Regions:
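C-terminal motif of bacterial Sec signal peptides marking the signal peptidase cleavage site
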Residues: 16-17
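An edge-strand/N-cap motif at the start of beta-rich repeat modules
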Residues: 28-63
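Short glycine/acidic-enriched loop and turn motifs that connect beta-strands
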Residues: 50-53, 97-102, 149-152, 207-209, ...
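Beta-rich, blade/repeat-based domains predominating
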Residues: 53, 77-88, 127-138, 142, ...
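Short loop/turn segments immediately following beta-strands, especially the blade-tip
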Residues: 61-67, 109-116, 156-165, 213-222, ...
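A short beta-strand motif characteristic of beta-propeller blades
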Residues: 70-75, 119-125, 169, 175-182, ...
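Blade-loop segments of beta-propeller domains
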Residues: 71-140
Length: 389
């Protein structure tokens, strides 16, 4: 996220209780009430910014081998810049990213996997401005948002109907970083449950820390401060997103400001840095997202503002270290991307030229080939997949 904020927090504290560009030559409207299922097709859900022509979340049917797609449906919601599906894929949760505390929210939807339609359930305020990331635990009972301008994270429990209860924890953070323009205060940009579900990590772009929390299934607070309370990365880095390797032994962080990928050994809630390698070689200070192929062989990191594209790395599965193998230019401002579960395609949401690009992944080299099956949509910023029933 690229915003300037001026508030500075001096302490860490816990507060309790507290239109549509959807088609081009490769994307056609799907008018059937019932979506036909094939072995290679999945739903693709896309979050957008809604200051222009987009209205909310869009659903497509994507062939995960050819890269062709069909528009299915949409649901109106303000600025759903990040989405997550629950483990059953019957419910979808999004942020409403807005700077105002009174309008920043988390939203719940039911998802009919037979007709590909989303139905709004409810929303709850996050209590922190500009929520830009949302995640859910492996049981589908607990939702957490990362609030960028609020310098906080928010916890919600999920009820039996898939709706969100009122926020029961808002955790705010202290400090600032070395970059006097971009790190004037805490900026939480990602919340990630560990593979075993015992901990939650929160990347703080503003203070160069990865905060650690214990996950408590019982007791008053779902989240409690971990030991250590945080892991610190190099000053001025701006840790943005974190992903775990499929073998659960390694974690990788993309840093927005320094343009690095940091590799960590992961063990029982602890991170040990093993490598830092450049993703952005032109000092654009706009690195965005990070992703790993399902087979664990390749890692991708997106860069924005200059030389927009994806840095491509191979992964040594023995020690977790990365080797750069290529770079693929993309459309303008690749804020987010997603790899299909079969590992064959990588789709890039290019916010500033209103397109989702569809690339084929070379299974041997990790390099990307443009399929030409672009999906035109105003300001796409998040891509997720779900199976078709």
């Amino acid at each position: 996220m690229l915003k300037k904020v001026v508030a500075v927090f001096s302490s860490v504290f816990l507060i309790m209780g507290c239109g549509n560009k959807n088609a081009n030559n490769n994307t056609e409207n799907q008018s059937m009430d019932q979506v036909e299922k094939s072995d290679t097709e999945m739903y693709m859900l896309v979050g957008t910014y809604t200051s222009g022509e987009s209205k909310g979340i869009y659903v497509y049917k994507l062939d995960t081998v050819t890269g062709t797609s069909k528009y299915i449906s949409e649901v109106k919601v303000d600025n759903p810049s990040y989405l997550v599906l629950d483990p059953s894929e019957k419910f979808v949760y999004s942020v409403t990213e807005d700077d105002g505390v009174e309008t920043s929210a988390a939203n719940a939807f039911s998802f009919d996997k037979q007709d590909g339609k989303l139905t709004f359930i409810n929303k709850q305020l996050t209590g922190g401005g500009a929520p830009c990331y949302i995640n859910i635990d492996s049981e589908g009972k607990h939702v957490v948002t990362a609030n960028y301008s609020g310098g906080s994270l928010t916890y919600f429990s999920v009820n039996e109907k898939g709706g969100l209860e009122t926020a029961s924890q808002v955790i705010s953070f202290a400090g600032k970083g070395a970059d006097t323009e971009r790190q004037k205060q805490s900026h939480i940009h990602c919340v990630q449950f560990t593979p075993d579900g015992k901990f939650l990590f929160a990347n703080d772009l503003g203070t160069d820390k990865i905060h650690k929390f214990n996950v408590n299934e019982s007791g008053d607070n779902f989240l409690s401060v971990g030991n250590p309370a945080a892991f610190t990365v190099k000053g001025g880095s701006g840790p943005r997103h974190l992903k775990f390797h499929p073998n659960n032994k390694f974690a990788y962080v993309i840093t927005e400001l320094s343009g690095d990928v940091i590799a960590f050994d992961y063990n029982d809630g602890n991170l040990k840095e093993i490598q830092t390698i450049k993703a952005d070689t032109v000092n654009a200070k706009g690195s965005g997202d990070i992703g790993i192929t399902p087979n664990g062989k390749f890692l991708y990191a997106s860069n924005r503002l200059k030389n927009d594209g994806l840095a491509i790395f191979s992964i040594n599965e023995a020690d977790g270290k990365l080797t750069k193998v290529g770079y693929r230019t993309t459309g303008v401002h690749p804020r987010n991307f997603a790899i299909t579960p079969n590992g064959k395609l990588l789709l890039v949401a290019c916010r500033d030229n209103d397109v989702i690009q569809v690339f084929k992944i070379d299974e041997n080299t990790g390099l990307l080939e443009d399929t030409g099956h672009d999906i035109k949509l105003d300001m796409p910023v998040c891509v997720k997949f779900a199976s078709i029933e």
